[in-house]
Amino acid sequence: MLVLALVAGGAAYLLLRTHGSPQQTAASYLSDWQRGDYRAMNKVSVNVPHGGLATPLGQFAAQVGVRQLHLVLGRVTPDSAGAQARYTATADLASSHVWRYTGQLQLVKQNRAWWVSWSPSAIYPSLTTGQRFVLHAVWPARGQILGTGGTVLSSPATIAQSGSISLLTGNVVTATAAQAKALGAPYHKGDLIGEGGIEQAFQARLAGRPSLTIQIQGPGNHVAATAAHFPSVAGQPVQTSIDMRYQLAASHAVSTAKTSKPVDMVVLQPSTGRVLAVIERPGGFDRALSGIFPPGSTFKVVTASALTKKGLRPSSAVQCPPTVTIDGRTFHNFDNEQAGRTSLLNAFAISCNTTFAMLATQHLDGSSLASMAKTFGFNARPALGIPATLGHFKTPRQGVDLAADAFGQGTDLVNPLSQASVAAAIEDGTWRPPQLVTNPAPPQSAQPRKLDAGLLNTLRPMMRAVVTKGTAAGVGLPPGVYGKTGTAEYGSGANPPSHAWFIGYRGNLAFAVLVEGGGIGADASAPIANAFLRRV
């Protein structure tokens, strides 16, 4: 009988004893909160509001702008209601501030288990029912966007001198409700934010961090308590490579051009790849940096470079008939011009399409032309700090596709940024990825590519011949200019419209001018380059 009594007593103890401990329950609750597992939190809590803890804890995170929450359990002590567990919360906020505070959980024992007795004070000690968190941010002075020599590009005075600057800088606007929501706390409707260009791309750096007050407000917006206050951090400048001397010279050349067509122009420094000027008329979409256009005969710089690797030289004898048929497609020169038997230098200078179509199919294949295009930055990803693109080149098949690509009337696509970098590479001897924002400089995935000496010895005299006796000879360009004209047909029909190109360099300046739908490069684009060069 005694043995039976002892066994029965032991079974009753096992059934009636409390499972777990307040430490275990508090640790489980905090771990689940940190992971955002609100359902698991509901299972270890009592007095849970209707709908569970997802609503109040989600509201807390949204109101304060919590990006990440780290919770550490502290001391657990018994009290008259059960036990209290202290914890340390470290909240990384969307405002880039870090909020640390000490909270506490009330634990109770019910039904032989420990539970978190939930109330708003489990989120923050002084928070009560009906209250919410409100952020008050006061933004510091915004950082400036600078050109060389400390010129403030983002100032109204600078933009008034050259409206194209705003395509690079973007604008500062008051945030809409949707924009503020997208940026997250501490942004509110009406705050100043960047829209487009550098202002948007470097919003966090330029805006700095506001002085931030986290308040607890009750009904009627009554301030019940201040939970935290953080001082402001001033906005930092963004340095660019834009040089207003060249920007204004290019702006004047474009604004006075004798054409009503859209004009896009980029000026680079060959020795560094830095963008010195970007001009567009009219404004709107950033075509000079992000547009895509057929290159026309400016692509002959790439093709001639590939031919050089196959042993051709400026003096190499070539044919320049008015037309040539390759795989059933007939290619022609502008106005069906012809030069008969001539040199490669002369065919390049007068921009003979048929010469390059024939030479490409005779000496090159798709991979060799694609490899040379890659050397000049095609398909590379530029890191200007704002959206931009370089040339696009798909490896052509043999025959008609290769022939068309060879003189820029295939699937190859470019913009003034990419073509200015091609000209810059011939001047410097190294293709360099273009740079616009220099501090903080975005990481570059594209690397400089050194050109071979034989290539340079071929291309430089050929580009000089374009100016002295070729398609640009009648423009009256100043001494020391090397260039290449381009007339790039687009659309369809017997006489399709064409874009007008002129790319080139003089000294440590490289440029590309595109007149969209402008016709002949020598007539429309080269005079703009001439006007620019004569002002610098």
Put a short name on every predicted segment:
Residues M1-S31:
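Short, low-complexity N-terminal intrinsically disordered segments enriched in polar/charged residues
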Residues T18-S28, R35-R86:
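Short solvent-exposed beta->alpha transition segments
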Residues Q23-S31, R39, K43, S166, ...:
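Solvent-exposed, polar/charged alpha-helical surfaces in well-ordered, non-transmembrane soluble domains
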Residues L30-Q34, V254-K258, G377:
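Short regulatory alpha-helical segment in sensory/regulatory domains of signaling proteins that mediates
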Residues G65-D264, H499:
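Extracytoplasmic/periplasmic proteins that interact with beta-lactams or build/remodel peptidoglycan
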Residues R142, L289-F299:
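Gly/Ser-rich catalytic serine loop of serine hydrolases
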Residues A225, V263-G291, A306-G517, G521:
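Beta-lactam-recognizing serine transpeptidase/beta-lactamase-like catalytic domain environment
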Residues G296-S305, S316:
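Active/ligand-binding-proximal structured segments within catalytic/core domains
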